Amino acid sequence: MELPQADRDMIHQLAMGMNERNRRQRAKRALQLAERVDEAHREVGRLVAEFRRIDPELERVVLFGSLARSSVTRLSFDIDLAVSTRRYLELLGPALASPFKVDLVDLDTAAPYVLEAIARDGVEKYRAGT
């Protein structure tokens, strides 16, 4: 049994409306995600400056993980930073106070698989003497 044309037209219009609503929702989410990523990059810059203030002998800061790879897909992502410093514990304060979840890794004691991830997709944000 075939649906009457009026019913088919109504179903088509409903589907088109749903598709448009879904498209708008996806566009809104993409914009929110892009804004959140921009905020995170600004926060990385702020953290690097704060780390340098706390430890003038800071050797290196590397961003790694999804933010470094530009592969963030969710609004609830973290910032992965690796540091080479003698004052690692003092740098935890600003990391914990961040509005983002920050995973702070000590390059001198990091597990081999973490060092591999950093070597693979790390983005150096600071190096002493450069």
Regions found by a protein language model. Name each.
Residues M1-V62, A68-L75, S84-T130:
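Catalytic core of pol beta-like nucleotidyltransferases
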